[in-house]
Amino acid sequence: MKKIALSLTILLGALSASNATAFDGDVNAGKEKSATCAACHGPDGNAPVNIYPKLAGQHADYIYKQLTELKSGMTSGGKEGRMDPVMSAMAMPLNDQDMKDLAAYFSSLNMSEGATPKDVVDVGAMLYKAGDAERGIPACAACHGPRGNGSSLAKFPKISFQHPEYIKSQLEKFRDGTRHNDLNGMMHDIAIKLTDKDIEVLSKYLGGLH
């Protein structure tokens, strides 16, 4: 818990020192470069297959960060960045401007809405908004916001309306350490305390959070 609090303190200090960062991606160029992406993420950025993430409406800075780290995962043999058998290979031929253009394009689109099953609303809302102090689990809303919109400056992703199946898989990867490109291991430190049921409830809850 102390590690998470320290990470947030460092992050907030860095953000206060700089009001914003210029993002020089080109939306039109990104649209032209996105044809290959559409196979998995959909022509409008809303992945038709739920194991792939929706990219529409995601923060450009976050998309750019993930693309650079996916490429780093491949070039380092998984020692750095984020390693994914499919996406790391797809990111390999992209140069820096390609990544910025793609990020700008997908962030300009609208993410499709999802729904939250009634049977997880109460438990999901409690865990997301308040966490679980007894187990040392902080509120998800502390970083991702009360509506799950995240933060562009902090590079915390928008997680509301995301496919539950994708959220579930990423929380499991953070928990078991197969994904480790989170700031100071914050997501691993949180996910390792989540049960399978917690992850299932949160994933479904986020599907319709707005």
Per-region residue spans from a language model:
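Gram-negative bacterial Sec-dependent N-terminal signal peptides
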Residues: 1-21
